Amino acid sequence: MIKFLNINSEKPYIHFQSLYQEALDNGQKGIEAISVSSYNQIKNEVEARYVNLKYISNNDWIFFSNYNSPKASQFESHSQVSILIFWASINTQIRMKAKIFKTSDEFSDEHFQGRTREKNALAISSNQSQIINSFDEVEKNFNETLQVMTPETPRPNFWGGYSFTPYYFEFWQGHENRLNKRHVFEQL
């Protein structure tokens, strides 16, 4: 589920919230999954991956990740991203273009402290996108981390939030006979 904090009253945000509720009412699975595409300057290619959108606060759309991951270095070197959401339950696609940046340490700390112990152990123990010998190694690291964690275990500095602020929205809704609706909002 996405948490809406101080939702922006501009039209694309209100439209998104309305579609989100409609998709939720229609049983959309994985409703918080969004595809974020970034540019890999080293390989001169675009890469996409799914992340879980956690918050929309004013103009900021926020998810959390490992700051040592390949996507993190891509965000650092090229802050332009493209976002895609598809909700099959209402045949709706939402595209966004945005600039991305890290959230404050305080916001990341607050979110980390509100998560389950297991999720935090995974964030701490995961060597995201690194080559490993086997999945057994992942499970071992996770279980060892879980055993030593306490409620006071702090957020690791290599894990935290990312926030993007869309300047372009495209809402596409499929209809019969390909008579589809498309609404575009762009900040000029």
Q: Could you describe each region identified by the protein language model?
A:
Residues 1-188:
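Binding-site signature for planar aromatic cofactors or substrates
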